[in-house]
Amino acid sequence: MSKVIGIDLGTTNSAVAVLEGKEPKIITNPEGNRTTPSVVAFKNGEIQVGEVAKRQAITNPNTIVSIKSHMGEEGYKVKVGDKEYTPQEISAFILQYIKKFSEDYLGEKVTDAVITVPAYFNDAQRQATKDAGKIAGLNVQRIINEPTASALAYGLDKDENDEKVLVYDLGGGTFDVSILQLGDGVFQVLSTNGDTHLGGDDFDKRIMDWLIQNFKEENGVDLSNDKMALQRLKDAAEKAKKDLSGVSSTNISLPFISAGEAGPLHLEADLTRAKFDELTDDLVQKTKIAFDNALSDAGLSVSDIDKVILNGGSTRIPAVQKAVKEWAGKEPDHSINPDEAVALGAAIQGGVISGDVKDIVLLDVTPLSLGIETMGGVFTKLIDRNTTIPTSKSQIFSTAADNQPAVDVHVLQGERPMAADDKTLGRFELTDIPPAPRGVPQIQVTFDIDKNGIVNVSAKDMGTGKEQKITIKSSSGLSDEEIKKMQKDAEEHAEEDKKRKEEVDLRNEVDQLIFTTEKTLKETKGKVPETETKNVQDALDALKKAQKDNNLDEMKEKKEALSKAAQDLAVKLYQQNGGAQGAAGQAGPQGAQGGQPNNDNGSSNGQGGSTVDGDFHKVDPDK
């Protein structure tokens, strides 16, 4: 097998490495640099990538930066002249450039690659990254999480004892914290948390905003509407940020930044590290949320962590290093360049794939829960967040109406209990279901997540064997804000969500109990005296009235009364008929209390679980 290169496709910069012998090595770009700016420019019909594109960004409006922030974002396109480009296409230009200079270095054609993504990337963002590789002419052998890759680079597989490692990854535009357990060559991710729209760019912007505000106060000129000035400010802010990692104060000088009535205006400012820390303190503190959540999800405390790794160029910021040291209670490991660790680790994984590296196993996790919408708008999870991948989970669902010919499977991703609050990944139909009473057809829904975190969903009618499948496409990806909002909302609205879920469950139970009781009464009509069924009928009428009045307290009370009356009737039927018919009668009303998902996570084939009423809508066969 030919060489498998490892690519860190970053927001601000990208890097590539390859395994030479048993050690990974960074491949330098044509300018001799070990990282390449993730910048693409269009000029006179030519596509420029990297250093040359970044250098002319000030004068060329057709320059695209930080495209990674838009990967998987539905409908997002960049317009250049009369042509539009998706984030995948722009990323592919960067990957093509990396592929070319890697081939020049290796002296052979490169076809295979391992590409890294932030641990908190969702399905759409991962799929978009894989598509970008495909567009660039690369066979993406594996998509792996950046923290896992950096752990590989630190050589932690060489440690004999089991270790729990916290990876704090703050890049140019994304941030996440992952907890890994390492030992005997196995790299198992225990949890991950983060924000796909927080990084060094945000720190740069704070400096830019400060410069703009000061300049406006001194000169009465607002630079925020001047595109050329903004690009110069961005470059100056990025340089100042880097300078302040090594010195306590830096001078920012931008001559001829604008013009006033008296002539040219120049920007001069001294920025101290203390002022920079003040401007960005809330950004640093914001990362503490993911830090705490990752530990909580892993069921660990900081005292359980054996080693802390800082990853991503933005972890060079002294305030970030100080904060992580305080939170973790130990000095982070600085032994590898944080800009290069991910690419080096990806190259090691490439060596695993090519067979050059043995005895290493990666066990990543899915960052968000996956499931479908069921009756009453409930989000029924099939795969919980932080589940080790690859994985597969099946569950049996059923129809919500008699003689329902088709079911609509609504696939969702998120953490909220109600489907309306989560993100739609896709929909598909399973048709030609034979006529049958509600609750009788058995529809097996299966979720498969592969080693790259890509989701496939299928629905199968167990009666006919007919099956429908879907691979979730990247156009349905979550935006940065949506991911952030999901978990924030889940925490803030936990009580509200619980109440709404309980209400929906009650309504579903009432519907099912009424349906089953009416069916039982119809079947026993003429077979037993009406005096025997009067209590059940009265209780049924009372429950239907409470349902019509939409009185939740009454519904709960009357549901319990009907359940008791139905059970009493079942006992009498059992005594009269020697057991057989009575047992069936008891199973009817009592079974009506079900309709909840099977929570047996130990089962992956869905067999033996209870049946769930799906949110499957009636389809008109004539349409």
Swiss-Prot record:
It comes from the Bacteria. Pfam families: HSP70. Induction: By stress conditions e.g. heat shock. InterPro entries: ATPase_NBD (IPR043129), Chaperone_DnaK (IPR012725), Heat_shock_70_CS (IPR018181), HSP70_C_sf (IPR029048), HSP70_peptide-bd_sf (IPR029047), Hsp_70_fam (IPR013126). This is Chaperone protein DnaK. It comes from Lactobacillus gasseri (strain ATCC 33323 / DSM 20243 / BCRC 14619 / CIP 102991 / JCM 1131 / KCTC 3163 / NCIMB 11718 / NCTC 13722 / AM63). GO terms for molecular function: ATP binding; ATP-dependent protein folding chaperone; unfolded protein binding. Belongs to the heat shock protein 70 family. The modification Phosphothreonine is found at T174. The lineage of its organism: Bacteria, Bacillati, Bacillota, Bacilli, Lactobacillales. Acts as a chaperone.
